[in-house]
Swiss-Prot record:
Family stated for the protein in its record: Belongs to the methyltransferase superfamily. PrmA family.
NCBIfam families in alphabetical order: prmA
GO cellular component labels: cytosol
Function, as annotated: Methylates ribosomal protein L11.
A GO MF term: protein-lysine N-methyltransferase activity
UniProt gene name: prmA
E.C. designation(s): 2.1.1.-
Gene3D superfamilies registered for this protein in UniProt: Vaccinia Virus protein VP39
Biological process according to GO: methylation
Residues binding S-adenosyl-L-methionine: 149, 170, 192, 234
Name of the protein in question: Ribosomal protein L11 methyltransferase
Organism of derivation: Chromohalobacter salexigens (strain ATCC BAA-138 / DSM 3043 / CIP 106854 / NCIMB 13768 / 1H11)
Amino acid sequence: MPWLQLKAHIAPQHAETLEDLLLAEGAQVITLQDAHDDPVFEPESGTTPLWNETVLTGLYDDLEDIEPMLERVRQQWAAEMADEPCPEIDYELVADRDWEREWMDDFAPLKMGERLWVVPSWHEAPEPGAVNLLLDPGLAFGTGTHPTTALCLAWLDGLDLDASRVLDFGCGSGILAIAALKLGARHATGTDIDPQALQASRDNAQRNDVADEHLSLCYPERLADERHDVVVANILAGPLVELAPTLCAHLAPGGRLALSGILAGQAEEVMDAYREQGMLLDAPVEREGWVRITGKAPA
């Protein structure tokens, strides 16, 4: 059965409004993608992706009355958005395909550093003897596909984590905490403001045979007043600046720090905030416009 596909180019801050209108008119699925093919796969829960222009695509299985439906969408948009013009919505018929299989085919195992692989559940591990982290790709939380997550994973892979205690602040899927444990850490703590993130971390820990006694998960306000050998935070530049005193307070003397979720143009502001806390910082590492900042606490 063919599908009716609608597509519109829209400013990111207005994408949710159009998405809601199309869903109300029976869209089976809505997807959002960067218009310039540089997607942010891991936005914080409840936030808008950091794109200049978004391509919104909707699929419908009802092929009749498309023009009346679009007219209703335009009228409702005008009622809700005042002077903001409704974006142009194009449509076409597309052949029926195995959408789930095509989505799965887009994701292959990813190697992070020298030892670590992130492996989707439907793939065989390319190197069974390597450190294999089983994690399926998703949009809400880190899965290794985004440069910021990849930068943090590669950094962890390069550390000697044997018997260390690790804090993953803003843990999302738990990917960084779980990776640290599989790379030799004695204990990891993951903290996040989103209960869905904490649940995702629990689920992924179980999938990777992480014992409960090696991983603690909590909200930030319940974080124990203790120091860690390694602190990693892959969030956003603004919160990282605000959290500088907190994150540094959780570092043991000589402990290692990694920060990401930072656009290249924001790096200096973030680095200044951590220099003020006495951190000894390395040169930032950039990938696809995003940077990782690492450093060491004074001994």
